[in-house]
Amino acid sequence: MADPRFYDRLGPLTLKDIAALSGAAISDSGTADQSVDRVTPLGEPVAGALSYAESGKLLRSAPDGALSGVAVICPPDAASEATRLGAAVLTHTAPRAAFASVLPALFQTRSFATDSFIDPSAKIGAGTRLGAGVVIGEGAEIGTDCVIGPHCVIGPGCRIGDRSRLSPHVSLQCSDIGADCNILAGAVIGEDGFGIAVSNGNTVGILHLGSVLIGDHVTIGANCTIDRGLFGATRIGASSKIDNLCHIAHNADIGENVIMAGYSGLAGSAVIADNAMLGGRVGVYDHVTIGEGARVGANSAASRDVPAGEFWVGNPAQPMRQHMRELAELRRLARPKNKTPKKG
């Protein structure tokens, strides 16, 4: 469910409304007036919510009635499976794009409610210092003894823990920051993730309705970008250190005491377990897990899971010893062969 600290609810919408907005077809006309006022991932069904399935494969393993009270947009060939699960069904050849087209009619991110730089409802703890030009939104909460640098923007509902420091020009939206954190200049935290759907050759952006959760004692480097989750949260665990110019995509999950060197990037839903280390310019593919205490060397691309405690390098990344053996073999193959001397 979208956190009301960060999002205004605009619904409800009936299935008839959804069909008009998305171009989807209602499978059973008797459900046309059923309404939804929230959204949910398919694996976490909630009555009165809208969800989507890109194929019937995601539905076949669920028990009968599992989606009772949920409205689901799915491909036409998956309609019978969704009906078996008790869902009110809409069909579309591009369910993700249809779902995306409906979201702005159900929710919007909260805007700055007044013309004041600091909203009267914001709570600012004792001893906290604000630089020139700071903007603080409705319902935001800042702990004690914080330092908020010039021209920082703290969005509605955001929370910042005690003794945290924000350098100039930091932007926070849809985010909770722990205590004793250090966010360096130009970091942008909590903006929309890079969620894209395609329908009939046209791209559709997906409004993200999640948040960013950052634990205590975390450092975020200058000009880092951290996207909020699509449904849930993008997470960074306590005492992790993120270097300058890193990107963390929607729903990435970073554990505690993780180190990411500069220019590293995580794709959506990547998982970095506790005490892992990423060298400079490391890229981690979506849904890939870097195990506890694992290391990935600089300029590597982790396209598959890295087991706990191992050291991987290369593009694609692989265990260090294997990588070095392959390099040695390539060097051997690349050596010029001895030329046979010409005869007399």
Curated annotation (Swiss-Prot):
Where is the signal peptide, in residue numbers? none
Q: Which residues form the active site?
A: H250
Q: Name one GO cellular component term.
A: membrane
Name the keywords, alphabetized. Acyltransferase, Lipid A biosynthesis, Lipid biosynthesis, Lipid metabolism, Repeat, Transferase
Top class in the EC scheme: transferase
In the record, what terms sit under GO molecular function? N-acyltransferase activity
Q: Which GO biological process categories is it annotated with?
A: lipid A biosynthetic process
EC numbers listed for it are 2.3.1.191
What is the catalytic activity of this protein? Answer: a UDP-3-O-[(3R)-3-hydroxyacyl]-alpha-D-glucosamine + a (3R)-hydroxyacyl-[ACP] = a UDP-2-N,3-O-bis[(3R)-3-hydroxyacyl]-alpha-D-glucosamine + holo-[ACP] + H(+)
Q: Which domain of life is it from?
A: Bacteria
Q: Which pathway features in its UniProt record?
A: Bacterial outer membrane biogenesis; LPS lipid A biosynthesis
The record describes the protein's role as: Catalyzes the N-acylation of UDP-3-O-acylglucosamine using 3-hydroxyacyl-ACP as the acyl donor. Is involved in the biosynthesis of lipid A, a phosphorylated glycolipid that anchors the lipopolysaccharide to the outer membrane of the cell.
Task: Describe its assembly.
Answer: Homotrimer.
Family classification: Belongs to the transferase hexapeptide repeat family. LpxD subfamily.
UniProt protein name: UDP-3-O-acylglucosamine N-acyltransferase
What organism is recorded for this protein?
Maricaulis maris (strain MCS10)
Gene (UniProt): lpxD
